A protein has these predicted regions:
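C-terminal lobe/tail of nucleotide-utilizing enzymes
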Residues: 153-257
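Conserved catalytic-core segment of NTP-binding enzymes
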Residues: 97-98, 102, 108-194, 205
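P-loop/Walker-type NTP enzyme "switch/lid" segment
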Residues: 23-98, 207-209
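Short, well-ordered alpha-helices that flank and scaffold nucleotide-derived cofactor binding pockets
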Residues: 8, 12-16, 120, 144, ...
Length: 257
């Protein structure tokens, strides 16, 4: 369960609350956001087309059919990652900021061009990590880049606000010593915990059907993302899905949601 799942869920959550939101796929060459958002057949132009002046921003933006406050800007599957330029991305973000309350940048894993550009322009950063040593180590490396190579760092402005999102979390597996605990991850990364998303079959089901999991209000993962959006917007929501749940007969029979 990765960054694209989270970007789609948070963007949808913000839009469903009435905030005009754009979500941009920075993973040039792969392009998964449109699949998770269920709009892959509606892609005509993409991020690189706009940067290269082959299409306008309005031509490339896809309005979500479930929520009219949400727009998707897909990545290109065919272009090289070097097609992304600081100037080009900066212009797009500046234009979007005139009309949108929130712009969610879906950053690819690693430190390739798309990731570094998404981080460069960030005001807030959702650090999405799994409770595994390798994933947490990668996140720690990303935090170093956010602190030193962002536009805010270059200009000596207030640093990027960083929030920790812990995905695929299982209290049962933590108890067995198979994954890091919330406390372990927080101690390593020294970040404010925005939320924990439990390991859940509903995430895969949602992705396969082209629906952000936050729309599945009956699932644990959907509820967790809704809580995360609420906390980000300043609401006081108690953390859930961190402690081991005492299961009754019903939940033992039917498993996790």
């Amino acid at each position: 369960m990765g960054k694209t799942t989270t970007s789609a869920a948070i963007a949808m959550g913000l839009a469903k609350r009435g905030h005009k939101t754009a979500v941009i796929d920075f993973d040039v060459g792969l392009r998964n956001l449109d699949l998770i958002m269920g709009c892959e057949r509606r892609v005509v132009y993409d991020l690189v087309n706009v940067i290269n002046n082959e299409a306008t921003l309005n031509q490339a933006l896809i309005r979500d059919k479930r929520c009219d406050q949400l727009f998707i800007l897909p990545a290109s599957q065919t272009r090289d990652k070097d097609a992304l330029t600081t100037e080009g991305v900066g212009k797009i973000l500046e234009e979007l900021s005139k009309d949108f309350k929130y712009i969610v940048c879906d950053s690819p894993a690693g430190i390739e061009r798309g990731a570094t550009l998404a981080m460069y322009f960030a005001d807030d950063a959702f650090v999405v990590t799994n409770p595994e040593v390798s994933s947490v180590r990668d996140s720690d490396r990303m935090l170093g880049i956010l602190a030193s190579k962002s536009r805010r760092a270059e200009k000596g402005e207030e640093p990027i606000k960083e929030y920790l999102l812990l995905t695929r979390y299982s209290p049962d597996r933590v108890k067995l010593g198979e994954m890091l605990s919330v406390e372990d991850v927080q101690e390593i990364l020294s970040l404010h915990l925005l939320g924990v998303i439990p390991e859940s079959k509903s995430v895969l089901n949602a992705s396969n059907s082209g629906n952000p999991v936050i729309l599945d209000e009956q699932s644990d993962a959907g509820q967790a993302y809704a809580d995360i959006v609420a906390r980000y917007l300043g609401e006081n929501k108690p953390h859930r899905f961190i402690d081991e749940e005492k299961k009754g007969l019903f939940s033992k029979l039917f498993g996790s949601k």
